[in-house]
Amino acid sequence: HTHRDGRLGSVVTGVFHKGLGSVGERNFRPHVSCVRPTPDNKYLCAVDNGIDQIKIYRVNRRTKRLELVDILRCHRESGPKKMKFSKDGKFAYLIYELNNTIQVYRYDGSGKNPVFELLQTESTLASHDDETHDATSGLCMSPDDKYVFCSTAGEDTVAMYKRDEQTGLLEKQCILPISGNYPKDLAVFPDGKHLAVVNHESNSITTFAIDYENKLLIMKGKPMKVETPNSIIFSKCQE
């Protein structure tokens, strides 16, 4: 639990994933890479990069336990990495590190158990060069929920998709280089007009102006030096 001032309290419960992955030299054991509550706060989605599954737990506030209710079984050797929900709570977006795709799911939590319906699968790659080891790593959405962005290491690019708010489906706008190595994460500024990308191997943060009309990302200024960055988030500070 957490305290009102944001401090972490004691651990209330814990779960342990078991099983073997399908990529022996890489992902061969459970490896949870993202945990995301559903927008209705009924369930917790644990994205397991190692065993190609998203385990869905019911949050039992009476017993303070997590109860496994369903498993989304992804393609073997796909490497699910990160998951985000639309603000209206109707759609989920999931990126895959190994097969370099993004998927759209419709979510419905109104029944006895959660329902995830796969709607769309799109590539995150600008090219399909078999000699490049690519890994889609970062996922974010614009503040107005109209655009989805993801970053891919290897070819070192960012993909921008326009999101249909009614259907949840994505339309690719561009996939462009980010002038850095291994873009592990990214975030849109609160103004919705700029994008920051953290580049793990080049020890940098690169920033871009987002030109939605012309479907472009325009680099702004020199990269900022940061030692092996992994993640980035914008948070409003108290005045």
Set out the residue ranges of the language-model regions.
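Short loop/turn segments immediately following the C-termini of beta-strands
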Residues: N49-G50, V59, E97-L98, Y107, ...
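Asp-box/WD-like beta-propeller blade repeats and closely related beta-sheet repeat scaffolds
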Residues: H1-C34
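Residue-level detector of Asp-centered blade-edge/turn motifs that repeat once per structural unit
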Residues: P39-D40, K87-G89, P143-D144, P190-G192, ...
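Short loop/turn segments immediately following beta-strands, especially the blade-tip
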Residues: H1-G9, R58-R65, Y105-F116, Y161-G168, ...
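Beta-rich catalytic cores
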Residues: H31, G79, A135, G154, ...
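Surface loop/turn motifs at the tips and blade-to-blade linkers of beta-strand repeat domains
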Residues: F16, E25-R29, L72-R76, S123, ...
